[in-house]
Regions:
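C-terminal segment of classical bacterial N-terminal signal peptides
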Residues: 13-21
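A short beta-strand element within beta-rich, extracytoplasmic domains
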Residues: 89-102
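Short, surface-exposed tryptophan/glycine-enriched loops
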Residues: 122-153
Length: 191
């Protein structure tokens, strides 16, 4: 019984000494800038969740057209500034993509994730139309890519859709409530 009391006291002390750092730590996504043939200026809507943990980007023009050579590949490069508490670093946890591929069309979605100055994992998927797709790139299971320690970092995502066939392939959902991309993050103390 004495061991249990000592153990519980130790756990309480450790929790009390560690929790304030995490309770006060606030990772804040500051928004996103974008550019590319699939997301020209003012063609996307950027939204950050109230808790600053999720970023949603809705695209209006991220559509590749298979039978128009100049439109076969569309790309979008994202720059996501994130404010970190001193002594923390972050990792991209997962990314959700939604879109549509027309009949008689094949769409290839490719995305690379990294922090400025580094390389990261690349995901590639092929969809055969007609289909609505909803996929997740689970980065935590294939890569452990962490930012540098500091007050702020710049997360980068380079996404591209290539279409072949007679129709279009989009990164933009027909689902009226949840469209585009959603990024989730995780964070830890610096190592």
């Amino acid at each position: 019984m004495k061991f249990v009391k000592v153990f519980l006291a130790a756990v309480t002390f450790i929790t009390a000494s560690v929790s304030p750092a995490f309770a006060d730590a606030k990772v804040e996504i500051l928004g996103a800038s974008y550019g590319g043939s699939g997301c020209p200026n003012e063609s996307a809507s950027v939204s950050v969740s109230p808790d600053g943990q999720e970023l949603t980007i809705l695209f209006d023009k991220f559509a590749a057209i298979g039978n128009v050579s100049a439109q076969r590949r569309k790309s979008c490069n994202l720059s996501i500034p994130i404010k970190l508490p001193q002594g923390f670093q972050i990792s991209l946890y997962d990314a959700d993509y939604r879109g549509y591929v027309a009949p008689a069309t094949t769409g290839r979605l490719r995305a690379e994730y990294f922090f400025a100055g580094n390389r990261g994992p690349v995901f590639s998927r092929t969809f055969r139309g007609e289909t609505d797709y909803n996929v997740r790139d689970s980065l935590a299971t294939v890569a452990n890519v962490w930012s540098a320690c500091g007050d702020s970092v710049n997360m980068r995502v380079n996404a591209a859709m290539t279409a072949s066939g007679t129709g279009m392939a989009t990164v933009d959902s027909i689902d009226l409530a949840h469209r585009g991309l959603v990024y989730h993050i995780k964070y830890r103390t610096c190592r």
